[in-house]
């Protein structure tokens, strides 16, 4: 666009210079008695008459104003306003021929005066005969003043060739008037072209503005996929929480891939289901058992001691097993109480101790836990499939130890999911 505008401006400058240099004007002045009448012919444009006379009506009809723009070597450049013939403003023109005003100031209008230039060397011998032929053709195109016919008969026989060139400018005047009307439409479209170019520029600007916002949302959409891979550290946060809660690792890893893949377009819902849904199933069953063990174990051990003491005092008809059970009961509360005290001392590491004890001394902890559970409620043994002994409430811990020593009933008492959880925990640790 800039190159095109530069080319257009350069072309206009060239055309303006060419028009100024090549426009030729024929100036016909009657310089006798101070040059009252000046007949000026603009080449191919307009023909107007400047009258510095008392006849104001003629002056108002033909021309109104002139403004001097630039002085050249031979003349001046004018901007011409015509009321009758040239309604639009004509371009600047150059006075190539000097004004024959004898070096005096010629008043073009009531407020503008132009000093006459020097005469050309070719036209210097002809200032005296020039007024004589000029009035002779002047009556034909336009009315001439009364003093003009008086000098015409005196020099008419001498300059016989002069009338021959004199009609030529008169004919040029008539010809110039006829094409003067034709260029008027040529001047009128020039403002229309300028008006058409301006809306085209405004219309070209509007689509460029609409295209730029269409490009701006594309970078706004691109950072959205870049933010989705940043959600990958969410699994890195889950293993940091899993070592604190050892059993909760296995269920937390299994449901996490399903919600993480589904809410990839949305950022917030992908994080919320992993934190809310996974801990609830894992923490409730696991936290309930160590709490029941820690709270019920001291009470269960005391109840076992009281029940065993009352049973030993009341039952004198039992065999040697009852006496051995009394001795074993005195020994059994100590590990159960120590285990319960060790678990109640550190509540924060309850899950870790329960898993470690169940990993290495499985029969001992299972015996204590099964003892406490059997003394509290007989239902777990019925559910596990083992037949209940004849006196479940008064059963001693020695019988349970004997069952665990066989190795057959110890594996039945442990649920399968606990073994799977312990094995997975050991697998992830090592």
UniProtKB/Swiss-Prot annotation:
Leader sequence residues: 1-19
Keywords: Glycoprotein, Secreted, Signal
Pro residues: bias regions: 124-168
GO cellular component terms, semicolon-separated: extracellular region
Biased composition (Basic and acidic residues): 316-325
Residue segments, region Disordered: 119-408
Biased composition (Low complexity): 169-253, 263-285, 326-370
Name of the molecule in the record: Putative uncharacterized protein DDB_G0290521
Record organism: Dictyostelium discoideum
């Amino acid at each position: 666009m800039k190159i095109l505008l530069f080319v257009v401006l350069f072309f206009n400058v060239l055309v303006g210079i060419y028009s100024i240099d090549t426009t030729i004007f024929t100036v016909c002045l009657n310089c006798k008695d101070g040059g009252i009448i000046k007949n000026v012919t603009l080449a191919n444009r307009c023909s107007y008459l400047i009258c510095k006379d008392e006849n104001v009506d003629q002056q108002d009809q033909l021309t109104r104003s002139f403004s001097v723009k630039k002085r050249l070597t031979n003349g001046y450049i004018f901007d011409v306003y015509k009321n009758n013939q040239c309604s639009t403003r004509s371009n600047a023109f150059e006075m190539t021929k000097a004004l024959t005003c004898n070096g005096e100031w010629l008043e073009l209008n009531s407020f503008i005066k132009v000093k006459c230039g020097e005469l050309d060397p070719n036209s210097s011998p002809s200032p005296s005969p020039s007024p004589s032929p000029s009035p002779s053709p002047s009556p034909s195109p336009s009315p001439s003043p009364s003093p003009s016919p008086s000098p015409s008969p005196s020099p008419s026989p001498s300059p016989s060739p002069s009338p021959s060139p004199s009609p030529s400018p008169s004919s040029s005047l008539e010809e110039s008037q006829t094409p003067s009307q034709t260029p008027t439409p040529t001047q009128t479209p020039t403002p229309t072209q300028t008006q058409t170019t301006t809306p085209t520029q405004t219309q070209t600007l509007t689509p460029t503005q609409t295209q730029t916002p269409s490009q701006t949302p594309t970078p706004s959409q691109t950072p959205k996929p870049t933010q989705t891979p940043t959600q990958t550290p969410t699994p890195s946060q889950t293993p940091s929480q899993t070592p604190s809660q050892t059993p909760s690792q296995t269920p937390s890893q299994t449901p996490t891939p399903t919600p993480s893949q589904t809410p990839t377009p949305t950022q917030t819902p992908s994080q919320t289901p992993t934190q809310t849904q996974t801990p609830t199933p894992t923490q409730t069953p696991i936290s309930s058992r160590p709490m029941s063990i820690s709270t019920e174990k001291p009470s269960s051990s005391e109840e076992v001691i009281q029940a065993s003491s009352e049973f030993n005092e009341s039952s004198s008809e039992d065999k040697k097993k009852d006496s051995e059970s009394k001795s074993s009961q005195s020994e059994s509360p100590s590990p159960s109480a120590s285990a319960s005290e060790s678990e109640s001392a550190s509540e924060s590491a309850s899950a870790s101790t329960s898993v470690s004890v169940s990993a290495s001394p499985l029969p001992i902890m299972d015996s204590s836990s099964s003892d406490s559970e059997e003394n509290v409620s007989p239902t777990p043994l019925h559910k596990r499939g083992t037949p209940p002994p004849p006196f479940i409430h008064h059963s001693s811990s020695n019988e349970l130890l004997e069952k665990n020593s066989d190795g057959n009933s110890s594996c039945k008492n442990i649920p399968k999911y606990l073994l799977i959880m312990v094995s997975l925990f050991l697998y992830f640790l090592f």
